[in-house]
């Protein structure tokens, strides 16, 4: 939590795959801004991505009370949307300790450990082997 010009700002960081999102919650009317662009525009108006970003706020019924300002880097839209979700959930935990239990129950605070598996030598991809010839 930090305050600038007597406005309380809550910070949270979220990660998914190679995406890292730094999320700020500022008292407002519920607008979402991602990298300086409107949230729905940035996420290509995809309802699944928008729902993921709004999920932590809707869980607590605060979707119209805070503006979400996001700086996100790396990865694609799926990873970025989930990173924003986790960052927003962590910022809401900073807001009040009572918010932690419902957010944890819904799974918004969990870091998804799945990431791209590394390529191994002798193989074409992580697990795809070259065609086998018996003779």
Curated annotation (Swiss-Prot):
Residues 102-135 are annotated as: Disordered. GO terms for biological process: translation. It comes from the Bacteria. Residues 102-115 have a biased composition (Basic and acidic residues). Keywords: Ribonucleoprotein, Ribosomal protein. InterPro entries: Ribosomal_Su5_D2-typ_SF (IPR020568), Ribosomal_uS9 (IPR000754), Ribosomal_uS9_bac/plastid (IPR023035), Ribosomal_uS9_CS (IPR020574), Ribsml_uS5_D2-typ_fold_subgr (IPR014721). Residues 116-135 have a biased composition (Basic residues). One of its GO terms (cellular component) is cytosolic small ribosomal subunit. GO terms for molecular function: RNA binding; structural constituent of ribosome. HAMAP family: Ribosomal_uS9_B. Belongs to the universal ribosomal protein uS9 family. This is Small ribosomal subunit protein uS9. The gene is rpsI.
